[in-house]
């Protein structure tokens, strides 16, 4: 039996997408939105991210910080918050109006303070949601996602990676 998931990996962006038919999960009636294409979350905006940190792997934890800058070349945000081991790959959110949030990206890494070599304080790297939008737009069904996963996909180019 084939696995009921499709995986798209982009090693250069430290990003992956796992697509699974909704019948296997209790998804909300209205899913969270993605930050619109071409929009950047403003510097200073409060953001949060979720994950299962290695220090408490059975508990979903929420972390918060503020956008420090936008890195155009990396298509990523730096946020002044901690992303401890185990949180990478988790979603990052921002509030767009009362009781409504959008996904702005994915937790990718934590950059320690290079001046002192200390782990804290540091910056969290949040990869932009654009890579996810490209993959989702290119899919018409779960079957098309499954067919496209035979080789790891480059999310940035939306084509198979070369070995």
Regions found by a protein language model. Name each.
Residues 81-107:
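Catalytic nucleophile loop of clan PA
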Residues 55, 80, 120:
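Conserved short-loop catalytic and cofactor-binding motifs
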Residues 103-163:
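C-terminal cap/linker of serine protease catalytic domains
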Residues 55-59, 86, 115:
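Short glycine/serine/proline-enriched coil/turn segments at secondary-structure junctions
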Residues 51-54, 71-74, 96, 110, ...:
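Short, well-ordered alpha-helical segments in soluble proteins
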Residues 17, 74-81:
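Short, solvent-exposed secondary-structure boundary/capping segments
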Residues 1-72, 104:
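Serine endopeptidase catalytic core focused on the charge-relay Asp
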Residues 31-37, 80-83, 141-142:
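Short intrinsically disordered coil segments
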